[in-house]
């Protein structure tokens, strides 16, 4: 059984723990469900599970950056939460580094307004943007986990 790795990218700085983690914890069971339907294993990387502002475990910011980028570059799928994307240097760097990787599918999750207000350069390598988690999961099921 093939295993895919999915990195959940999105703004963390300046957000409460629930704001940075809620959308991720909502999406994880849906991703696991579609993976099981496709007879595929999926490893989901929620960066909040490793480093966060509520329970800091890092000694240097570079440690967090190195870890996150290592996870991005070893993933086949990245889902970016559009809310706050354009004001999150970490998420922008993850996106830029990931966009250089040929086998990484980058998808966006956000409202129509967030999509319309996103700078064209930040949209360039996002294959598809959905405003609903279920539609995003349908796309992943039909076009990514194949």
Show the residue positions of the predicted features:
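Conserved catalytic or regulatory cores that recognize and/or transform ribose-phosphate-containing ligands
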Residues: 1-146
């Amino acid at each position: 059984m093939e295993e895919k790795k999915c990195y959940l990218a999105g703004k963390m700085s300046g957000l409460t723990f629930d704001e940075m983690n809620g959308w991720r914890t909502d999406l994880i069971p849906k991703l696991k469900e579609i993976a099981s339907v496709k007879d595929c294993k999926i490893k989901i990387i929620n960066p909040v599970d490793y480093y966060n502002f509520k329970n800091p475990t890092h000694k240097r910011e570079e440690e967090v950056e190195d870890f996150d980028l290592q996870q991005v570059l070893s993933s086949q799928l990245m889902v970016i939460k559009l809310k706050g994307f354009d004001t999150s240097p970490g998420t922008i760097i993850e996106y830029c580094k990931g966009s250089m990787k040929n086998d990484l599918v980058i998808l966006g999750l956000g409202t129509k307004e967030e999509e319309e207000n996103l700078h064209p350069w930040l949209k360039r390598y996002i294959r598809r943007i959905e405003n609903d988690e279920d539609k995003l999961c349908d796309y992943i099921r039909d076009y990514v986990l194949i």
